[in-house]
Amino acid sequence: MEVDIVVVAGEPGGCGVGDLVGLGREGLVLNEAAEGFGMDEDLFLHPNEQRSLVGGPESLGTPDLHPKDEDLFLGTPDLGHPRFLLNHDWKSETAGGWGIYSQRMESSPVSGTNLLETAASSYLRSARHQPVRWHPWGEAAFTRAQAEDKPILLDIGAVWCHWCHVMDRESYEDAEVAKIINEHFVAVKVDRDERPDVDARYQAAVSAITGQGGWPLTAFLTPDGRPYFGGTYIPREERYGRPGIRQVLLAMAQVWHERRDEALETAGSVMSAIEHNESFSGGGGDLSLVLVDKIAASALAKFDPRYGGFGSQPKFPHSSSLDLLLEVAMSRDPEKPETARAREAFTVTLEKMARGGVYDQLAGGFHRYSVDERWVVPHFEKMLYDNTELLRNYVHGFQSFVREDFKETAREIVGWLDGTMTDRERGGFYASQDADVGLDDDGDYFTWTLDEAKAVLEGPELAFAADYWDISELGDMHHNSAKNVLHVNSTLEERAAQGANLEQLRGLRDAARQKLLAARSLRPTPFIDKTLYTGWNAMAVTAYLETARVLRMDSVREFALLTLNRLLNEAWDGAGTLNHVIAYPEEAGAGTAAEKAPGTLDDYAFTVHACIDAWFAGGNMNFYRAAVIVADAMIARFYDSTAGAFYDAAASEKGQIPLGALGARRKPLQDSPTPAGNPTAASALLRLEALSGRQEYREIAEDTLGCFAGIVEHFGLYAGSYGLALERLLQDPVQVVVVGSGAAAARLEATAVARFAVNKTVMRIAPDRLVAGGIPEALEETLLQVLKPEGAAAWALVCQGRTCLPPITDAEGLLKALEGAG
């Protein structure tokens, strides 16, 4: 068959790595004239500022944003790839313009079966029927590629990813495309949720090559797994000036067989650049609160005062940065304008998000992000990790400002998680809910036409709902202009201020919501991935325990502890390691398949936090001991005792060669999309040092944060968790222990949690637990020395560092003590 081979030889519009060597002037030129990789702090590309390495928006694998194709951005900001610092003076010597030439290449079918039949991952199982001879990630695929001297086609996606489904249907279910793949490649499919270690490395590689990453990720690898080209979504046919997948496949096969030296040189350059940058060698510096304030100021510089959030579009919540701004707002001089600005950024963003279509106005819970600056039209998938972190934001907002709207949103998030995303019997939080039911819809389950609303509501309820949620004949969706994304035009309180009766408005809203939700429940429901991921479940445990304490929701606390017990029983293998997966969905029939997914730094760090939070929730020493055990295992498996900081994945066993890009060691710093592994680990160790008294925990945490201090301010919005960890390091921990039971203890506990502070922890304990062995070692040194106040039914002990104040029996006295400790 005759195919067109695309020649990319245009003027690059920026790059991700300064030392890439291209594939020659006749085609797929990446950068022939790079002048070396630099650490120039002045030219730093944030994810939403990254540009294509290989030319304009039509370049291979670099989808541009068309008015009706915002989805083609494919999550680059969500990935958060501020990974590469560039040289100012890098320029291309390639000729401008584009060229096309043709060559005859024959393809023929290759016998073989799809090897995903026994996969446990929901994403991989969804591809079992495809004619492409997919392999799961593993040694067998690489062995075959090297034995047959074939390049590897790597597809990385997720079960919740709309454009992954589109590419599956358009291309990987097409017999002609499958024939080309099976003839010329060894095909490997990876679930990014199941293997974040694999995804992170190839995202960095493709971002280096094209300036963008996202899902689906489509990468072309040497047989040993080093990437020589890649992109994101590739259409089946040529579209928007981009070649179709058949052209790309045949071009990549030709490159491997006819211009192999150039492909190998490019692959080597990409891998070297990734490993150099991901280790952050030479990024150390001084630690101070000035650095925290610089990170906060960088986030504030992007704050949108009109619509909330940061930047323009697409908009992501950036939960860690929101908490950092709240910390600044509550702990800095209230007279300074930046303190007021931080408070404004936090509160306005939470207000606008909860009013927008990015929030499910009927069932609660947040979609992944908004494609517009107003938070109206989202990408409709709902992720566990987004909702646990946003739940914490709203709980912290209620703590600090006693805002009933923040409390209501937090309760609604819990309601959605409880009803849709949990295994109520055994414990555990499910991973995600898909955006769509079918490939031809875009959020149709969540959106409404005016006629659909009229079929459910009538009279005053219809009139109210249409006005309140902006339901009209002209909707919001590009694929169906009649479809409306429900979002709040003006709040009930704003309407009441104009003279309406607030209680009547609330009654109308609640009645309309209940009827619309009941009608929506009759629609086909988007797929829920019931995989239980260790790190995400640990994040959920922490969020639930905070919520339970602040909002006094005992059932939420009990479910969190049930989940944590399951995590420790099923993900901890008894040999000192955590698995990345607690359990796969029952329909996978995977049995012990979770053992095949190795735990990452995130899994360990979030689990340490969850265990500490569980101890504070009830004083069960088993959770404290688990925190110590998991923390010690985390240090043993991931800590770089020579250069400092933590790797995201454990080193290969002695004598084993890591597969593909897993040979590149990474030290995660940026929040993308969850809080980054290194600051999360450092924060966990600081909390544990305050309980255990083990100084090495603090030393490792300080060393870890110091490794990035010279570079982290450039990460701005993506460094929120680092700022919070550094704040925790530099401020003495404040521990509030409420001793007793009944109403008096409840009042003291409510006072203790009344304001968010990153360095404050609160626990309530029975008097008989204040004995040697009943509390952690460091607390024994302080709490057991304090005399019980005579005749008091309950009292509070406030300890800062290693010093405790005398027992406090009244709420007013406790509040004053906390103000002094803050």
Which residue stretches match the model-derived regions?
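Extreme N-terminal basic, low-complexity initiation segments
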Residues: E2-P12, L65
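Replace the tail clause
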Residues: G99-A543, T547-V550, A588, Q656, ...
